[in-house]
Amino acid sequence: MKAQELAVPGDTVWIRGGTYKANPDKVARTQRIWSYIYYFGKSGKAGQPIRYWAYKDEKPIFDCSEVKPANRRINAFQVMGSWLHFRGFEVTGTQVNFKGHGQSCNVENHGSHNIIERLSLHDSQAIGIYALDGSDNLFLNCDAYNNYDYTSEDARGGNVDGFGGHPSKGATNNIFRGCRAWFNSDDGYDCISAREVVRFENCWAMYNGYGPKFEKHGDGNGFKVGGYGNTPLQPVPNPAPRHVTEGCLAVRNKASGFYANHHLMGGDWSYNSAYRNSNDFNFLMRPPDNSEEMDGAGHRIVGNLSYRGIRDVTKLNAPKCELKDNAFATEKKFTDTSFESLDEAALVGPREADGSLPKVAFLKPKDAKLASEAGYTAYAGQKPPSK
């Protein structure tokens, strides 16, 4: 990429609007089983990031649909450098091209001190953003939607999450903030096998585990927060990281809205709202040796709200958790008229001019006191203590 070759720390590479069709004959790098369509290996510096930004209000679209190397995993944007800032473009059409187990990614990050902002990752067979190595990264105001792997593993779509946060040991302070995930064939957000803490702040998850016509696909959790698989012999960290999920919203996901996923440590769950999921909140855990399932213990559960889930709260050992100011449907006699709006269409509407989430009244209690104490509407503009 000529622009990357010429860029130095402090530069901004402006990307003009229009559709950029990735050329199958000009893949940036092939390495082992991977093909990287665009590869970013050059770093900026502290206070002098290299920026790759959409020009003004123009809309660049990177269409990767024609890149289909046989028997390779395909990553559209492979980010290996640090002190980089990507903003304001779309990635679409990233393919899967083999039948066995594997995955493709629209964006995969390994660098540190990066900001990935206002990207739209959609209508592909690939994970939206997949974060592995690197520290101090912010994934800000991004959307991942309509992503479904219909090629590998009998087309069940089980590897395509909207956002994956799976940091390796030492990869600390990685945050997903203001993001949306909907109609991804597996989970909205997933941090299974994370070796360090992952934070989800003010993020939304809708209709995951389904296709756009509500055809059933993969697991279908809104927020899958933790876990290390089902095999006790799998090496696990001790202690496991204590993940943070606050100010988030989960709507009509196929499985759980918020799911502890057999994690080995309690989590911090503050000011989240769940609506019409199979399980609105599922706190299932395992002990530190990963040996057996148990009801969740050691969780801090403050100011959360649920309504119309098939199960409101499940797999929770309440006496062994801290619970405060929650408005769960089993305790509050809500009706549809208890809320200012239940208009789900507003949740996938256009973002604000600055890239922030659309301003909606969805699932906001009409009771002003309750609206200030519980649910994602109580979180706006706050940073409630997590520990």
Positions of predicted regions on the chain:
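Right-handed parallel beta-helix
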Residues: K21-N23, A28-I37, E66-C191, V197, ...
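Beta-propeller domains
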Residues: R180-G247, R252-M265
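Parallel beta-helix/beta-solenoid
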Residues: V8, K42, G47, D57, ...
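Short, T/G/N/S-enriched strand-turn elements that build extracellular solenoid repeat scaffolds
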Residues: K2-L6, N23-S43, C191-S193, P235, ...
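Beta-solenoid repeat scaffold
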Residues: P9-F62, V79-R87
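A structural signal for beta-strand register positions
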Residues: T19, K56, E90, S120, ...
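Acidic, glycine- and Ser/Thr-rich low-complexity intrinsically disordered tracts
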Residues: D11, K21-N23, R29-R32, G158, ...
